[in-house]
From Swiss-Prot:
Enzyme class name: hydrolase
Listed GO biological process terms: butyrate metabolic process
GO molecular function: hydroxybutyrate-dimer hydrolase activity
Protein's cellular compartments: Secreted
Listed EC numbers: 3.1.1.22
Full protein name: D-(-)-3-hydroxybutyrate oligomer hydrolase
Keywords: Hydrolase, Secreted, Signal
Reaction catalyzed: (3R)-hydroxybutanoate dimer + H2O = 2 (R)-3-hydroxybutanoate + H(+)
Annotated signal peptide: 1-32
Length: 707
């Protein structure tokens, strides 16, 4: 069957768009005749995995010049630009323009993009695998395969994407996964893991985990398709990335009471998508096998034979944050040898902890460990605005556009509300704030992250996660307005219900992160006085809503869904590396990597091949490192994620032993906040083969991390 060709632009770049009609023959089962005593099995046809929606599959080739796999044609320079890529017709962005915007925004969202912070010198499209500036603009030619994984209902529509670089060696095949971090779209981990895989010549298997940036504008019934373009929800049908499960009557009623609101896939799919993140990662790998066989299998008429069978390709499951947790879950669930090894950064993972697991630092038990996200995030969302006023948090980076006086007023009022509710004690704001910070310490937050409590809430990272995950775990409909929160557009004063001058839907695929506030869609609290930006809806920053979210955890409402996402830390002897910053204030290290190490050691014993590298002066968001106060105090975790990937590659290919678990004592850049000196290797000591007194130990489930 003839392939379909479409011209992308007047530049002369002509990517190939091959519809599934041209590939359907791969589902035909081949029969072969063998004679003369040939004992070889007959060739096997390359069959599209049953979970892939056949009509959704599409491929494109990028020439590595006008467009490419890593930078969407922007190159190192274009990615570094703070100016978003242009859209010719703002009222109707094309799929190619939205892809370019998504790659630009997602790349920048996970790494420090400043030259002094390391971009272009330690990482970036121009930096080769040895850390040298040899790759110019760093554009990478190759082919993309894009599809939905679904059960036939059209309600899952997990996006899977495979990038095969032109440098892929079919005789030495490799796959690197890049499961999206956060609730990002399918390109969410392109800088965190995809880039390294492409430079290594590996196919990269991406997935949005079924929680990626699908938005539904309820007032217009516009939804996004797999490529980010828009369509009416009814017309889109099963091709919609996400459509809220609402009847026409319910939708009309909700719109009349709460105009200009939005449903998001992670929050409102009512499927608890996190329970499937490991499976989604495995599906992405299976799709990569199919894509590689489609590209390199022997041509047999109109079909391709299977060249690569399950387990025959060196595959590293890699990503960060939620993508890191998904990678660990996938490795635990892998029963067919799809995953060879695991390398993850700052994994968000929820553990099924037995009593034998314990965590200590310097021989002293930590305040708490192994709590699930639903627990620690709802607590932090209540306490952080108040804790920000504690003397120990003075001088924290300021990460909000609100005036300083407004922020101080919110913090003071939050302290008063917490005290009135009996959550904290103290007769004045300073005492109350100190008590709030102490309560965070008691619940597993490191003193290393004291200066991050304020920016985690001010940036709205913590409120956004608290609301979205509560919705997801409660399997709440968008019409529930769980705890009186909703997602909507607001005016300059923060008032909700306003019709935006330009719909955020046009670019939500490119700019959105899947967790409002994002791309002009804000987190709204519907109070008795009216609906507004949650920070401004009440004097205390919508404390009633935050308290309600906390109660959903403490009263057991979320328990069933949280239990469904817990893992056992049994990696079945796969070599694995976890890297995390000690100062992480979004996913506290005491609730993630440290207890995972203990549980893994307990589960696997002597068979465990997990190494854990804890990095001092590193926190969760490398993209914040260009902000004043972050630059001078914190180092990039991404640097160590790259080192870990190189260490694992050497281990798999050369048998080089993985360095044991250890603390890496980094040196902050110092200097004036906002003008810190350039990052150098003096700030970034290496991961060492013999850590000595910096070794992290785990025995019988007990983890001890040296100070």
């Amino acid at each position: 069957m003839a392939s379909v060709f479409k011209v992308r632009s007047a530049s002369g770049h002509v990517p190939v768009v091959r519809t599934l009609a041209a590939m359907m023959a791969v589902t035909v089962v081949l029969t072969a005749c063998h004679g003369g005593g040939d004992n070889h099995p007959p060739p096997q046809a390359n069959v599209l995995p049953a979970f892939i929606t056949a009509s959704s599959v599409r491929t494109q080739f990028y020439d590595g010049n006008t467009d490419d796999l890593l930078t969407a044609g922007l190159g190192k320079t274009g990615l570094a630009s703070a100016t978003a890529p242009a859209i010719a017709n703002a009222a109707q962005p094309t799929a190619a323009e939205l892809r370019r915007l998504a790659i630009w925004s997602n790349y920048r969202a996970l790494v420090d993009m400043t030259a002094n912070g390391g971009y272009g010198r330690f990482w970036g499209p121009n930096v080769d695998l040895n850390g040298n500036d040899t790759l110019g603009e760093g554009k990478i030619a190759g082919k993309e395969y894009l599809a939905f994984a679904d059960d036939g209902s059209g309600t899952q529509n997990v996006t899977v994407l495979v990038q095969i670089p032109a440098s892929f060696n079919p005789d030495q095949p490799c796959i690197v996964t890049a499961t999206s971090s956060g609730s990002r779209g399918v390109y969410g981990a392109i800088s965190a893991a995809g880039e390294w895989g492409l430079k290594r010549g590996c196919a990269v298997a991406y997935t949005d985990k079924g929680s990626g940036n699908g938005a539904h504008e309820l007032s217009s019934s516009l939804v996004t398709l797999i490529d980010g373009t828009l369509q009416n929800a009814t017309a889109a049908g099963k091709a919609s990335l996400f459509t809220a499960n609402l009847g026409n009557t319910d939708l009309a009623s909700y719109n009349s009471r709460f105009p200009n609101r939005y449903a998001f896939k992670h929050a409102h799919s009512q499927q608890n998508p996190e329970k499937d993140w490991g499976r989604n990662t495995l599906q992405a790998i299976q799709f990569a096998y199919w894509a590689l066989n489609d590209s390199y299998g022997t041509l047999n008429g109109s079909t391709r034979n299977v060249r690569y069978t399950s387990g025959s390709i060196t595959t590293i499951a890699a990503s960060v944050s939620n993508g890191g947790g998904a990678s660990l879950a996938a490795a635990e669930q892998d029963t067919s040898g799809l995953i060879t090894a695991v390398v993850v950064g700052e994994p968000q993972i929820n553990l099924r902890l037995p009593a034998q697991v314990s965590v200590a630092q310097g021989g002293v038990p930590v305040g708490a460990f192994g709590k699930p996200l639903a627990d620690y995030m709802t607590l932090a969302n209540m306490l952080q605005p108040c804790a920000a006023l504690a003397p120990a948090a003075a001088g924290a980076p300021y990460l909000t556009a609100l005036p300083g006086a407004t922020t101080t007023s919110i913090r003071t009022a939050r302290c008063a509300s917490l005290a009135a509710a009996g959550v904290i004690a103290g007769a004045d704001a300073t005492t109350q704030a100190t008590n709030a910070l102490a309560l965070l310490h008691q619940n597993g937050y490191q003193t290393d992250s004291d200066l991050l409590q304020a920016p985690m809430w001010d940036s709205q990272a913590v409120p956004a996660v608290a609301v979205t995950y509560a919705d997801a775990y409660a399997k709440a409909s968008v019409t529930a307005n769980l705890c009186n929160f909703s997602f909507g557009t607001t005016n300059a004063a923060g008032t909700a219900g306003v019709t935006p001058a330009v719909s955020p839907m046009l670019t939500v695929f490119g700019n959105g992160n899947g967790v409002p506030p994002t791309n002009g869609i804000n987190l709204v609290f519907n109070s008795g006085a009216g609906a507004a930006d949650h920070r401004l809806a009440t004097a205390d920053g919508s404390y009633a809503g935050a308290s309600c979210l906390r109660t959903l955890w403490t009263n057991g409402t979320l328990t069933g869904s949280v239990d469904a996402i817990r893992v056992n830390a049994n990696l079945h002897g796969k070599p694995a590396i976890i890297v995390q910053g000690r100062a992480d204030a979004l996913v506290p290290i005491n609730h993630a990597s440290r207890p995972y190490l203990g549980l893994n050691q307990l589960s696997e014993g002597a068979a465990s091949r997990l190494s854990f590298y804890e990095v001092t002066n590193a926190q969760h968001f490398d993209a914040f490192l260009g902000v004043a106060g972050f630059d001078s105090r914190f180092v990039p975790l991404h640097y160590y994620n790259l080192q870990a990937l190189n260490l694992m590659w050497s281990h798999l290919k050369n048998g080089t032993p993985l360095p044991p678990s250890q603390v890496i004592h980094t040196v902050p850049r110092g200097g004036t906040p906002g003008a810190a000196p350039a990052l150098t290797t003096a700030n970034l000591p290496p991961i060492v083969a013999s850590p000595g007194i910096n070794a992290i130990t785990a025995a019988n489930g007990a983890v001890n991390v040296p100070n």
